[in-house]
């Protein structure tokens, strides 16, 4: 066995080695390369197909293989690659060759003249075949690139060490694949030639001639194919000669300004080339080569070019033009930037012919690939994406050479530069020597440390200093004078002084320096050191830290000494070229020989350390201090800034620019809807101010083409061949999508219609298969919903069709002009020819029929019809004015009040039926009020819609005729009716007589029956079962008996007539058929045990069967009853157990228990679900568990459940202690202090676990002290307090409502539907879906078991909700969960019998979102006409509504419960945009429970539709973040994100008014508790504090911020331009917001959006009308124009719009290249708490009242955000502070955080000394018994080693990331201190 396993293991390892070997992998990839067939194969196939002889075939194959071999070699041999890859070589060689090839006629055999039979290799045509195949194989990679090839070549490159072996093996693999391919081709051709069926000569007689013709034209076919291929590729790649030259920011725009800007700006606008490859001029044609060339040192030797501004200059050129560039060399700070940007004045004077020819023809910086230009609209250029994120280099570590991926790029760069310019004479030590050296140095360090420690210990013991200090022998000059040599040159002195220099004044270091002359120093260093070190490494930015120049000079001096000492030969070589007169013999190293004067030394240093900058304005020379330049990595950027057409239009508005835009954006047309000329400024209603501009302002809408946008922001002139593979599955989609994310996209698109249609088809089939009729009838609401869905689908389909037609018109050339002219023609025809002629004809006809003519009415209607010209998408302009460019852009003609010809005008009233609904009439009227004209003269509802049905002219006439005929008939047939009645009477008489006869016969038969007793069986009644009887037979199983007995009779015994026999036989057959039918149905049906329908009549006298049936029925009833009552039995059983245990365990009197239970009555009420089970259409299977507390409550307080039919599903596993105490922890402490005695008992309980008891104690849930003291509700545990400060965790109800799909939410709502919709105050304290033990009883029907992908969303949302609920449950009673709805309490007071504190009616902590408090304990009156099932409110609109003081809420509400106008005071805090107010409980009148939330009854239309489709909630980028931004964005350092101009000027006044208000409240309310008073005071203080802290309250500060943050040059230009115009504050503000933060898109809510657009369409028309009253009134009546939207005043500031909810800030996905710091910031961001949250945290933590004066003293401490009071400790992020949310982990973590000792959790009393206010110490469990410093160090050291498991399990969405790969916590090696200034 051992041997076998050993052999097997060896075999496996051998196989693995073989598979992973370079040769095998090379073969594999080479074989794969075969499949990327390119155009080069055309020549190879041509040689085979044409049958030109084996020689040509051989030469073609040889050329093909040679070309491929060259390609493989060129991948690894840089010179060959550069030669092939340069754009100009390819262009120069390829274009002439292609032309020659295509226009060389094949039948003129140019190359055959030299052919001899001796040697066919001399035949030029064969050589040409070889050349063709060779060259096209090269084209296959460079000119006709295939992305597959490029990627395949790159795959294995970094892993293989032996590169040539890999190249060889991959070539061999390619060869094998190629041979196989050619064999296959040969077989196919042979089969074609041999197969007779191919050349069937049924119809073609001259078959031979056809084949020969085909063979002759084959060459032409191949040439055409090749030509098409090349044209296809070359059409997509820009021609290098006519490449669109993109404007660089550096050349023109930056010119004069950039030197004024700060360092930051120059860095950001600079263009950095990513790799040396690009600097060498190779194009980005082939991405497969970038990576390899970075490593290749040979490539650097190819050329010595240095690019300045795109011009290639060799080294000699630089020496020639040295005076021109001298300044840039001296520029210490900007030298690299100047090399990149080329901001050189002299450039502009150079003539064009001085530029090299190649640079003119080929712009190496052009966008050859379809790289997407990622815009960053603030100030940066386009990002290049060729740079790696890490920098790899070898470095010694622990004595060994290892590859480091975090190597400092500066070191590597410096080394490379030095090695490039001068060969270092040092030899590399062997690895063993390195390792030994490292060990030796380590030993030395240890010895030194030990020696130092020993000496210190000796000092501590009190030994003499002279004995302890080290004694050294020194070298001195003179014995008598005791003058020593300097330490640096003392050979006897070793140790710390040896080889180091003391930093002191430069004048004192005369002896340390070297002694060349001033001239030579200057020339060497200026001309050569810069030449060595300043090669253009553009991928590094320079961060400059200023240092003291004095101390710096000594360092530089010493480094000069060292460098010159080591590299004299190299310097002499380079210096000799430029300065031959320099004498190097004068240089010496010994200080005694020659010394330079200190002033000369200073000058030398000054040349290095100072830069002489020519100021662009005054041309003066100024000195700037140099800094140590730390070379750091930066994002590589392109050198130009590209604009799209929208930006171009913006620039055109601001200044006339001749430049064309470079980025292709979506097809759009600018539709001008209104032109504001100077003369009609009075009627101007546009939102723009009319400035004194020369040209008229145009109001325009942008109309996007509905086609899919495949231009994808491509740059003009870039290549399209290698776009990402994209698919489209919709007729029109805005952007292309990758198929990877199909599962994330809403499945309503046509692409997915197939599988969904299948589901729709399957549902009814399944239902029919399972049961004939459904078990429960669907409710009306479901039917309505289904109809609505159908209607919406139909509308969507119609809309798609309309869009499709519109796009067809838009794409065909000249189609718009044709259509427009046809429309205008049809309009003229209709208005002036067709309708007048119809009116004339009608009235003449009326006169001929002796009716009154209706000239007046008809002409009035005809005059009223208006034909209004509209833009292509339907914006109305006017009757006479045509849209601008309507022949190209398109036109619509809208007919207002379309005239409809009727036979008579008074028929309208007659035709209207009495039962017709006025609403439907209104709708009809709306529809008929306008229409659009089609090109055929028809009417349609919407542009491009289907023509609507015209009301027929003759229909009313026919109806009228029918009425007349009916009347005639009525009179004519009256006689017949009388006749019919007579005949009826006669028949009735005869029937009665017949009855008497029948009865008489029956009586005789009865007498006869008495004679024959057996006939009892014969005349038994057999009833035909009715519908109910059928059901009875199903359930009672008795139906089998009677037919059997009937069937077993002996019919011959009876003397009955033949007729009766037939009747009985018929009855038997019918019964038998019914039985069979019923048994079949039984097999199909699901039995329903509780259907209990009694039969009409039992058709049998058998007593035994009857008793059996009776027993069966009784047992069935009993079992149903048992099933129904089982939960009650279980519940009572559990009650008993729990009551006994509770009463035994908690040793307090029963009275106390009763008090406890009564005091918790309010909380428990919520879990009692008083609803009936048999509500129609509601699936009751998902009812939740009733908590055991409610069972105790029922047994002790004798309360009855109001409805006995309630079904309860109970599960014992749910009632664990952890769960019980989890539930108890939600109850306010205030009500639970009586449990204190249980928790105060410090010994072990039989029942209560110590851990849970400790947890409750530390949480402050139970107060162990007496009930008369103040409860500890205000104190909180530290970790929870910390979490409370982060907006990520305070998710509002709106968010939870969006978590899961709408269908599922509807199901929840249905289940919670309130039965009594008519009662005004109905109880909505429904049972809450419990997340810890959620038993979702799935519906058993097969329909609902269809797989749904949305289950995952539900699961995620449950975890999120559980964590959210667990973290913030102390905000109120129960925060919003899962499906928890707006809870509306019945209008009654909750009893407080035992002097407990009543909760205040409105208690909202400042700065916490008000939407968190919805649905907790506040009472809402909702009007009864509104839909009571609508439980979700979208706060996106209402969020900013109440910003002004004294807003009267009453106009918003439409209530019948009385008017209460509350005065709302609101703080205008810059960051916290939440509602903050106090409503006095005693001031309201009899309706005192009617609360602030009344205004939620407003405007249902606005609220009913959610803002956007948020099903994939887990993409934070796509979600409407109004919830995140409505409160201050605490973890986002960009403070200016939501700045408002002039918004906070009156903040002090407001604070004063608020103070007055609060004091007023105090005076009015005589019943304010101490709690309330404390809250009011704290509230007041917080407001003052925020008012003082508010940095945005001063407009000057804001101006300063703006000027600091505007750094981009183009933005600066715009700003300078803006200064010329005097703009209003609002415009400045809007410009500022939009221009600076363009990655936020502003949009408004959909319903509002639609209404505003409708209004705009009407305005456009009204503005042009002379008398607009009639149209305006009719449009308001039709509901086209909305008055509430019109109420917006003229010049609205953006802030006002945002406050009113008209604009919503919706962040777009930032186009920024994420890097390490961003991920670190994402991860650690939640630890950064903004200062405005400190007071909330403090308010929750503190226990005592604090005087206001101390606050005023302590506000200065809030300047630093994360610094503690004493400013010594910094708050660090400890992941163990964040609790994990899966399963029961929260308990374990809590217990490990808070030990059982109650003293550890400190409530942090605030010290009354103002200097020591603890403003941000919430991360540590601080205590007076605990040393915080040690604790901090301990945690800092320890935490990475544990809690990682919990960290990994944490819900990753809490970190604001959208996939797990960004969870980069483990990348961070060290956690620095975080301070946000």
Swiss-Prot record:
Q: Which organism is it from?
A: Chloranthus spicatus
Q: Which Pfam families match?
A: Ycf1
Regions crossing the membrane: 18-38, 64-84, 87-107, 124-144, 172-192, 221-241
Its function?
Involved in protein precursor import into chloroplasts. May be part of an intermediate translocation complex acting as a protein-conducting channel at the inner envelope.
> Could you confirm whether the keyword Transport appears in this record?
yes
Family assignment? Belongs to the TIC214 family.
Taxonomic lineage is:
Eukaryota, Viridiplantae, Streptophyta, Embryophyta, Tracheophyta
Keyword annotations from UniProtKB, A to Z: Chloroplast, Membrane, Plastid, Plastid inner membrane, Protein transport, Transmembrane, Transmembrane helix, Transport
**In its UniProt entry, what is this protein called?**
Protein TIC 214
Q: What processes does the entry annotate via GO biological process terms?
A: protein transport
What membrane topology is annotated for this entry? Answer: Multi-pass membrane protein
Which stretches does UniProt call biased (Basic and acidic residues)? 685-695
In its miscellaneous comment, the UniProt entry states: There is a partial copy of the N-terminus (positions 1-454) of ycf1 in the inverted repeat (ABQ43318).
How would you summarize the oligomeric state and partners of this protein? Answer: Part of the Tic complex.
Q: Which GO terms describe its cellular component?
A: chloroplast inner membrane
Identify the stretch(es) annotated as Disordered.
Answer: 246-313, 644-695, 774-795
